Amino acid sequence: DTKYIAGQMMLVRSFVLGINIVAVEPTGNPLENIEQQLDFVALVPLQLENIINYSRERLDRTRCAIIGGAAVSNSLKEKIQNSKCNIFATYSMPETLSNIALQKLNGNDAQDYFEAFEKINLRLDNRGCLCINANYLGEEVVTNDLVELIDNKKFRWLGRIDNVINSGGIKIIPEKIETV
């Protein structure tokens, strides 16, 4: 959806990489009716789960998938281990304009941490939350994400200091739900 930065960045990636865009209506299984081989697809974890359950062969015909909008569960990570598609979890937020780090989720080179892109540097603030420095950003981005910082390029995401739940890119505040 190009109303969001993630959708806009898919268009930018296609222009930069010279790849075709295959647009589908937002759905729980965007590969369901796609017959051709794809080079690149962006999904949320629920879509990946549905594809694994109902259209796995279509995922295996896809060269690369990025997964964002929410954390990928351990059970889903197990289900994708043998996929022929290279699958990466993304770390991003609107303030960073796009992904700043990837975690390879499957295959022999799977990672248990995110690794920041070149020219992105990371540190922790006094709360233990991730701070992002990038040459294209005007100032440091201070997040509410608690992480285990391995070095200035690698981290493990632990959760949110403010208890906000990110589900498909929608931020849910448990305290607001309790008042309903």
Question: What is each residue range found by the language model?
Answer:
Residues 1-50:
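AMP-binding/adenylate-forming
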Residues 25, 45, 69, 91, ...:
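Short loop/edge segments at beta-strand edges and connector loops
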Residues 84-127, 134-140:
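Conserved ATP-binding loop and adjacent catalytic segment of the adenylate-forming AMP-binding
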Residues 1, 44, 93-96, 143, ...:
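Ser/Thr-glycine-rich phosphate-binding loops at phosphate-binding pockets of nucleotides
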Residues 38-40, 63, 145:
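Conserved acidic residues
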Residues 54-107:
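Gly/Ser/Thr-rich phosphate-binding loop
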Residues 144-180:
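AMP-binding/adenylate-forming catalytic core of the ANL superfamily
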Residues 45-46, 70-74, 171:
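Alpha-helix N-cap/helix-start capping motif
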